[in-house]
């Protein structure tokens, strides 16, 4: 029963490192071409001007955040940082952002479980389709530490295209997105609460897809 998780971990490890150059292609296939659209749906939930992206990957959201025409970038004093454990992803993101005409992106290599930032630094932290590290108590403790009081951790753990093929597969396999939503609500929420967050789990329907969003607000000290 543990074989599948091990295979998935092996796949993800290589996808983020030695096979990082295939990441965008794989993401496009598994999302039916909606990958960047899904990631951009986190933008309306971002608050404040000091932003951290955990697991910036190949830099799609970083590019949008730093685009001078974006609604987020219009905020005065915007400060955006991206963090990823993979040096290969760092190089891909750097190239993407520089090609977009942004001279000096703030990208750093590191672990979410040991963030290299001072306490109370960020207004928002965002993570799109993160691996299991996101519910590691060390990750959530670090996110709570570097967020300002009332700051927001935004996590998009899953999304589904509105596809007839997928609906058929759900019927055949007996599985459905509803099960994932319930797991996140019942199990993930407890991790966030124990780390000092007030948490809500929302499903967001857009034109082509259904997205799962976790919104965790850092509780302010009384």
Question: Which residues are covered by each model-predicted region?
Answer:
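Conserved class I S-adenosyl-L-methionine
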Residues: 2-46, 60-64, 168-174
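Class I SAM-dependent methyltransferase SAM/SAH-binding core
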Residues: 52-114
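A short acidic, Gly/Pro-enriched loop at the edge of an enzyme's catalytic core
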Residues: 113-124
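A short SAM/SAH-binding and catalytic strip from SAM-dependent methyltransferases
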Residues: 124-135
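A short glycine-rich, Lys/Arg-flanked "PGG" loop and its adjoining helix->strand segment in the class I
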Residues: 138-149
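Conserved beta-strand signature within the Rossmann-like core of class I S-adenosyl-L-methionine
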Residues: 151-158
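Short alpha-helix
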Residues: 180-196
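Core SAM-dependent methyltransferase catalytic element
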Residues: 196, 203-222
